[in-house]
């Protein structure tokens, strides 16, 4: 059933119909469309278009349809309706006859779809927030279990200074917490209802749009009808949030792919999130993580595509805006799936503490400690930096770590070095000295874990 046609003397070409129809993807808005229609029927009572009895009949039929949709949403795809609005209205007319044709009074598909999409976005943000917090909790739990797992920290993918696996986990907790705050912030701007704005100039019926917004669970109604039906910056905002969130998950995945590699060998992933090779029987591939990393690109693409779609559109509604849904649906689905998968990866991960500690002791990760030691002895830092660089060259030449050089070797570079240098070159000393807020000291890490647990409880 088409919602238009009186103006036309020829039927649409079937090829155009297939090109134009959106039911194959906007069927996902069925529940929101029905909920919005129930609220609209109540608004029509307040302006005398519907009687209370008519509204009750419509609401009952819409609620029956809602249950049918929840039981089998795929049934919608068997229809040749143009879009979800046409499908819902057609089904309603099947149930209540001519009365169903009164429901669209004063309403346009322009404000209808804007409302449906905002309702869907609000529901989906709630799901994303839950998944995000579940992953944060999984990271905090993994951190708590691995506070003593010393490993190398990297800059430029070269061993830099010792950290702990717990500190690494907590770094991603911070990123995810910012992702969470962005979603919460987006939810505030989503929480305004466009219903009642009509096609572009507002509805001709004196409907209380604030009351209507409240019936739909919105905090308020939008202030400008042109803007309400023609902008999709809330879509851009969620796509931006998804793009940033997926970058964080991609980096998380890349780190663990490296940690799991034969070259690093810091962790072993569970069999539940890995796969094998059809040719090489020894392989255990980190496919879950590689897919998280790979899926990041499609989310960035959805954001870029939507920005390009909107950038040249004149006010108000244009059919181009039908392109807002597929990329949004896919991007948020992908982000949600990846949040769940990242949590699953952490469930069963094994940290190889001896190998991590061995790697942390290599690569002269304690060189900065020697420089700080010299500074404490009165040597200017820039000079100390140069002295330690020379000492590292000597250690490399001898094939030894810094702490294995003799005192005589070290004193060749600075006479202020004494026997008390050796304790400060230990891994434990390196960690304990980083005791300022946010540092890697055991005390700071334990405090950060407790604070994160309290925030997430």
Curated annotation (Swiss-Prot):
UniProt keyword Cytoplasm, yes or no: yes
GO molecular function terms noted in the UniProt entry: argininosuccinate lyase activity
One GO cellular component, as annotated: cytosol
Record keyword Cytoplasm present: yes
SUPFAM superfamilies given in the database record: L-aspartase-like
Keyword entries, A-Z: Amino-acid biosynthesis, Arginine biosynthesis, Cytoplasm, Lyase
Subcellular location, record wording: Cytoplasm
Transmembrane segments: none
Gene3D superfamilies: Fumarase/aspartase (C-terminal domain), Fumarase/aspartase (Central domain), Fumarase/aspartase (N-terminal domain)
GO BP of this protein: arginine biosynthetic process via ornithine; L-arginine biosynthetic process
Annotated family: Belongs to the lyase 1 family. Argininosuccinate lyase subfamily.
Protein name: Argininosuccinate lyase
Protein source organism: Klebsiella pneumoniae subsp. pneumoniae (strain ATCC 700721 / MGH 78578)
